[in-house]
């Protein structure tokens, strides 16, 4: 669980021809090696960017003594480039599994691009607050949601791919303050564009699930096979628009722009 300061150096950085791959220690001849979920944990990075939590800090579930959150939206936790995380999501408590890549309070000074999560038991990527941007990232056949945001996340995602298995959950699950004041600040305002969500035909889960106070800006989506493309409810005093210019919508976190 790296926790990086504003002077952080690279965390994991590789080239397209030789990506870093995290996966199970099982022998390659084991039948679970290729398709198993929950065979190990996952990658967790904690930073010092703002989060929507009383006191301004919190702990990732299952980790104590390593808080995340702070006051620096430009916090730099280094570089995550050409990284694959497969077969993770081991359970640390009943109904509590580890995400493939968790970015908790990570700031926009951090680089996350060309990363992939596959066959994770829980979510693919989850951002708890912070302002980190994602670019060229993919999630394949995870057991829960592909991209999950919470706790006042205000970053951006672009050129993202979701391929859902029959038992996968949502393409996106976007929250702001779980079990709390839906209008608390900072309010989640993910800005995602150029996203493809591919599902089996008549997949029972939403492609995008927006709830619990989130705002957001969502553009240029291709959605295939979901029963519901976008489901939006339980969002407090949210303002919904399609008329604001992009720069205006991104600068007003109380708006949902679709």
Task: Show the residue positions of the predicted features.
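Extracellular beta-rich repeat passengers
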Residues: 6, 21-122, 126-258
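A short, structured loop/turn motif at beta-sheet edges
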Residues: 13-18, 77
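Single conserved hydrophobic/aromatic residue that forms the stacking wall/gate
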Residues: 1-8, 12
């Amino acid at each position: 669980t790296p926790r990086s300061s504003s002077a952080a150096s690279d965390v994991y950085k590789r080239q397209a021809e030789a990506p870093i791959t995290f996966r199970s220690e099982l022998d390659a001849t084991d039948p679970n090696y290729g398709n198993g979920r929950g065979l190990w944990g996952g990658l967790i990075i904690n930073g010092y960017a703002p989060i929507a939590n009383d006191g301004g800090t919190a702990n990732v579930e299952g980790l104590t003594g390593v808080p995340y959150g702070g006051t620096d939206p430009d916090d730099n936790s280094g570089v995550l480039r050409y990284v694959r995380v497969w077969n993770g999501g081991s359970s640390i408590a009943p109904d509590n599994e580890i995400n493939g890549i968790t970015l908790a309070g990570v700031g926009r000074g951090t680089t996350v691009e060309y990363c992939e999560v596959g066959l994770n038991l829980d979510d693919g990527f989850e951002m708890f607050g912070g302002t980190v941007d994602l670019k060229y990232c993919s999630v394949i056949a995870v057991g829960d949601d592909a991209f999950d945001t919470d706790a006042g996340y205000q970053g951006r995602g672009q050129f993202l791919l979701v391929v859902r298995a029959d038992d996968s959950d949502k393409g996106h699950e976007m929250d702001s303050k779980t079990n709390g004041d839906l209008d608390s600040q900072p309010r989640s305002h993910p800005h995602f564009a150029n996203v493809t969500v591919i599902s089996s035909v008549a997949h029972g889960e939403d492609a995008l699930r927006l709830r619990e106070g989130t705002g957001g800006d969502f553009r240029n989506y291709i959605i295939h096979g979901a029963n519901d493309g976008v489901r939006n409810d339980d969002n407090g005093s949210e303002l919904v628009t399609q008329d604001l210019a992009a720069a205006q919508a991104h600068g007003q976190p109380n708006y949902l722009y679709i």
